[in-house]
Amino acid sequence: TECEYWMESVEAGNLYVNRGVTGAIVNRQPFGGWKKSSVGATAKAGGANYVATLRNWNQMKHFLPMKEAADEWLKSVGGLAIDPTGLSVEQNLQRYRRYKKGLLVRIENGTSKDELDFLSWLKNDLGVMTRLSSDSLITGLANLVVESAEEFAQHAKEFDRVRWLSAEIPPVYELMKNGISCDRRPITLRGDIEVSRWFLEQSVSITQHRYGNTNAGPKPVCSGLKL
């Protein structure tokens, strides 16, 4: 339907179907998270991931147990469109979308094999578009772009977001000038927490009545992330 086509095509953090756009309600319509409404390490305000951004998580050491937790999250949360409220007159769905231009990831010689395995899994198994960048060659990485931090900042304009996993000082000012958000958090051992950071959160609010009649009006289907 037209509504479903619109929901799959429009690029925004909050979508409103057959209703006004006044929202920003905790849990029901969390806000932000897209484009210039997202700066640094953040998540939708009032959403399921927001509290997790307010604490530090231990850095990952082993890929396989982290992947197991990430896989479980993808099955039970990430791949679905979830309505936490269950109202009969309105759907308030939370789902995840892919970055259209992908993420530019800064790594270094000290980046562990387990971290590289995670980045490879994101790209090859989940279809997350990433490009790896470093200031020097790293053995075994054929698709690595070797460049300075200044060159990195210029190339970042081609991407939606930056993930900085290097001990270097990131060119935050240059990135901010170009409207590019930079996430400097290390990869965490919590797979369910970490994998959500590589997707966009989206809230979709759909009116399910016509003048108070819950059996009238369009009933568009809102799908979750295609994995």
Which role does the model predict for each range below?
Residues T1-L227:
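Conserved C-terminal structural/oligomerization subdomain of aldehyde/semialdehyde dehydrogenase
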